Amino acid sequence: MNKIINLFISFQFLLIFHSCRKNPDPPLLTTKDVTEISYTTANSGGDVTDDGGSSIVTRGMCWSTEQEPTVQDSIITEAGELGAFTCTLTGLVPNTTYYVRAFATNVDRVGYGNEVSFTTIQNSVPVVTTAAVNSIGSASANSGGSIPSDGGLSVISRGVCWGTGQEPTVNGNKTEDGEGSGTFSSSITGLTQGTTYFVRAYATNSLGTSYGTAVSFTTLAPPVVTTASVSGLKQTSAVSGGEVVSSGGASVTDRGVCWSTSSNPTIDSGTKMSDGTGTGAFTSSMTGLTLNTTYYVRAYATNSIGTAYGSQVTFNTLKENQVADVDNNIYNTVNIGTQVWFKENLKSTRYSNGDQISNVTSSSLWQSTTSGAWRYYNDDSQYNDDYGKLYNWQAVTDSRKVCPDGWHIPSDAEWKTLEGNLGMDPFELIVTDFRGSNANVGGKLKKVDTSLWTSPNAGATDETGFSGVPGGYYNLDGTFTGIKSDGVWWSSTPAIPNTNLAYYRKLNYSNRGIYRSMPYGQMAGGGFSVRCLKD
């Protein structure tokens, strides 16, 4: 009887125990946003906040192309525990929308987080950038590129392409520099010197070819140099120079001029004068020349690519009794007694330092100007070759000097020395008006040429070699007078100190003497010829 009672009590106990036991709930969790989405992968995860009353067995992610994915779909799992976790979803298809949920399991139940959707990246051509161009030479350069993304497909070809057009393609010049993504270097060859090229990196996958941004560069070349005109002509020297207008892309290590009596001189075949480095203008002196000789000169400039030359300039050194002005007008000279004179009238448009003398053709401006000025007789350039130019008083007294270096405007006293050397009576030297007719002083100074002088050109013998010509003059009243009849030349001596009245000399076609201006001289507003006297 007691045994039956005990069994009954045990059964009741078990019945009570089982009737009191509660089934566990599913775990509680959330799904993280999807990040780092690529062509075939993405990152997500979850956060298990409640185990549902039973230990977490596993947790992970499930995903599908259909909504509300379950553990029966694609999953990734890891050991279960409370807390946050992250997983990488793999094996995805590009350009596809997926639905993903975090899940966790306990002993009896599966819990799911909220659903999150995302779309994988669509496959594309690669992404490529062009590297800077370096090691530029005359026929080659280096570049390359970087492929940060293959577009989801293997890169099967990469390199750079180049041309003179702004958007070169692989159909033109190109390099082939391997496969795959990452960085690469490329050597560009077969280029033409001094040419601007455009280069682009390229990368190709099964979808096509993409290009980086075009980068331009210019290949190196010899410098570009011009030759200056020749100036400062003398019997054994001259001045030239040039300008390096482009370095060719490389440092100019030498520049100057080279010259020879043969055409197209070089730094190897001729004589050279080196004048510095770099770009810009330069001046070169040529010395040791032979008088009365034809020379050829070229400017040169050298960089690492080579030596370039400017155009050839031809010049002649002066004969023994010649001098040149700053404009390269050449004058013959003559010794008369103790003096050396020009045999021609001055033609220069510049002072001896190179500054311009104004060409003034307005009568009012000529009268009012306080600066040096010149003009042709009758403002007609046809008179220049035979008669030279007419200058005002301000020009002949300017400190910059109208005569070439080593020469000057003769003073009244120096004109008297010339006249005395030709036999003028000493008493006449101080007289004004025409003097020295008895000694034919004027005739000895006049050129014997009735095409230049009006007949009879009285007394003309030119036995001195002075070769005076009648270039006429410009009057204070604004008129030109005396072409072919009167030659009028300035002296540097004021007729009255501290005034604008100056002495001058005149030869006339009908008089054998030479005229010295009256004591009141000539108002400085006149325009006369100039003969230069050696210092």
Where are the model-predicted features located?
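Alpha-helical interaction segments
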Residues: 10, 88-89, 188, 285-286, ...
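Bacterial Sec-dependent N-terminal signal peptides
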Residues: 1-27, 318
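Short, surface-exposed linear motifs at loops/turns and structural transition points
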Residues: 20-319
